Amino acid sequence: MTKRERIIQSVLVKVPKDAINQFLSHGSTPISVLFLAALVGVLAGLVGTYFEIAVHFVSETRTEWLKSEIGHLLPLWLAAILISAALAFVGYFLVHRFAPEAAGSGIPEIEGAMDNIRPVRWWRVIPVKFFGGMGALGSGMVLGREGPTVQMGGAVGRMVTDIFRVKDDDTRHSLLASGAAGGLAAAFNAPLAGIMFVVEEMRPQFRYSLISIRAVIISAVMANIVFRAINGQDAVITMPQYQPPELKALWLFLLLGGLFGVFGVLFNKLVTVAQDAFVALHKNDRKRYLITGTCLGGIFGLLLLYVPELTGGGIHLIPDVTNGNYSVSLLVMLFVGRVLTTLICFGSGAPGGIFAPMLALGTLFGYAFGATAKILLPDLPIEPGMFAIAGMGALFAATVRAPITGILLVIEMTNNYYLILPLIITSLGAVICAQICGGKPIYSQLLHRTIKNDKLRQQDLPEQQNS
C-alpha cells in the first residue's frame, strides 16, 4: 500500500484519529461548526435547486408527451389520466414502502427531530422525498416543493453530522436547523426568510445561541448562493412593483388580516379533518393507499387539461392574478376550488408541501378583496395587487403563526419592498385574530397528530400480538 493510499484509508476509515475529527473536537471550536454549516448550506442548496429543476422537467415532459407521442396513440383525456396516475403512484409507493415520514410537508418531522422525538433517516428520506416529490408534484397535484426542500435540507444537516461523526448534541441540533434554513432559502430564493423561519417558526425547538444562529445564517446564505449560481438572481415570482399605499388606506389591510386570521384557523382544522378522512379511507393498508393516490393523480391529470388553475403548487398562477386576468367572481370560485384541492392533495399523504398552495390562496382572496374595495371605494387610491401580496403574507402568518417569516418571504419572492408596512399590518392582524380564535400553528398541530398516531399504533401492537 502506498503512502497516499494509507492517508486516504486513515481519512475515510479511521475517522476518530484523522485531522477532521481533531478539528471538530477542539472544545466545540466555533469555526468547526461554521465550516460544517457552510457545507450543509451548499449541499442543501444543491438538493433544493435540482429538486426544483427535476420537478419542472417532469412537468414539461408530461406536457410534451401529451402534445406529441402518447397524445396521438390514445384519447387526450385518457393519456392525461394515465400519465399523472403513474407519476402519483411512484410518489405514494416510495413513501409507503421506504419512508412513511416523507409523507406530507416534512417540516413537522424536522421540528420533531429538533426535539429529539422523531428520527431522521436521511439515507431514506432524501431519495424518497426527491423522487417521490418529482412524481407527486409532476402529476399536477396541488402541492408545493418548499416543505420537501426544508425536510431534505434538514436531512442533509443530519447526514453531515453522521458522516463527520459529530457527537456534540448542540452541534448536531444546530446543523439540523441549518439544513432546514438552507432548504427554505433555496426553495424560495429567500435567505432572510430561511433564517427567520428557523428562528421564529421553530422557536419552541430551536436552541438559541450565538453559534447556532451564526450556523443558520451561514447555511442559508450558502444555499442561496448555490441557487442563484444555477437558476439566476431573479425573484421567484415576476409581478408588478407597487408603490406604498396612502396612509388612509391602511385600515383595509388590517381588515384583510382579520379575515385571513379567521380563515387560517378554519383551514388548519380542515387540514386535520382531511388527513383523518384519508386515513379512515385507506386504513394504512398499502394497497388502498396506492389505489387512493393513483386515482387522485389521474383526476388531477384530467383537471390539468380543462381547469389548470386548480392544479399545481400555484406559484405559476400568482402573476396571472396580479396582472388582472380574472374577474372577482372567478377569483372567488378559484379560491374555493383551490381550498378543496389543497386539502385533498395534502390530506392524502402525498410527498409534497403546503407553502406554495397557501401563497396562491392568499393571492386569490387578497386580489378579490382589493378589487372589491376599489369598486366600493372609488375615491381611495389603491391597487388590488397590493392586497394580493399582503394576502400571501397574511395567510402564511395565520396558519404557520410566523408573521415576520411571512413578511420577509413575500418581500423576497416578489421584490416589493415598498409594501413592507401594509404587509406588517396585514400579517400581524391575521396572527392576532388567529390567536383570539384559539387556533394552533399548523406544523405544531401536524407534529402532535403524528406523535399521537404513533402512540396509538404502538398500543395496538401488543393487542394484535396477543390476539
Swiss-Prot record:
Site keyed Mediates proton transfer from the protein to the inner aqueous phase: positions: E201
One family name in Pfam for this protein: Voltage_CLC
Intramembrane-annotated stretches: 107-114, 175-187, 191-199, 385-399, 400-402, 403-414, 415-419
Membrane topology reported for the UniProt record: Multi-pass membrane protein
SUPFAM superfamilies: Clc chloride channel
Gene Ontology molecular function: antiporter activity; voltage-gated chloride channel activity
Site feature Mediates proton transfer from the outer aqueous phase to the interior of the protein, where: E146
Gene3D superfamilies for this protein: Clc chloride channel (1.10.3080.10)
Residue span of motif Selectivity filter part_1: 104-108
Periplasmic side: 68-74, 231-250, 308-327, 375-384
List of residues binding chloride: S105, I354, F355, Y443
Listed GO CC annotations: plasma membrane
Catalytic activity: 2 chloride(in) + H(+)(out) = 2 chloride(out) + H(+)(in)
Keywords: Antiport, Cell inner membrane, Cell membrane, Chloride, Ion transport, Membrane, Transmembrane, Transmembrane helix, Transport
Presence of the UniProt keyword Cell division in the record: no
Residues in compartment: Cytoplasmic: 1-30, 115-121, 165-174, 200-212, 280-285, 437-467
Transmembrane segments: 31-67, 75-98, 122-139, 146-164, 213-230, 251-279, 286-307, 328-347, 353-374, 420-436
InterPro entries, per database record: Cl-channel_ClcA, Cl-channel_core, ClC
Assembly: Homodimer.
Matches recorded under HAMAP family: CLC_ClcA (MF_01128)
Family classification: Belongs to the chloride channel (TC 2.A.49) family. ClcA subfamily.
Record protein name field: H(+)/Cl(-) exchange transporter ClcA
Organism for this UniProt entry: Vibrio vulnificus (strain YJ016)
